[in-house]
């Protein structure tokens, strides 16, 4: 368990990704692992490449949050759940704009530090759900669609080693390689 201050910093950083609250993200991720490659998998490649890449975001708005009772006992998680949009918008767009005001480039700062950053982070994450279930190798578990892709791993700081991630889901590492 991380110190509360570290948990708080992680919550702020995760909020900046604009990929849903901790509860929603973890609920979807845990369901993905339990129901991999089935109809119940929120971002299943079996529903098509578009669905796995970004369609699940568009279609999955009212999906039930389940399997995260352990997280509901954490006050930082619950604070973020109640204030998700305020925290995310402030950190992702308002703060870059204000920093830009200080340096005389508010719209450039908003564009690079906000809009383009969020767009890049989203698509790099979406590559894991789509490309890493479509292209790559399956060295650890050949019977599932999750694959290891070195170039997606490069773009996502190791997250592209997705076959490893599914086979050894309790391992804190993204893969066995340092890169």
Q: Where is each model-derived feature located?
A:
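Non-catalytic, topology-defining segments of multipass membrane proteins
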Residues: 1-126, 131, 171-179
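Active-site-proximal inter-transmembrane loops
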Residues: 73-76, 135-161, 167-168
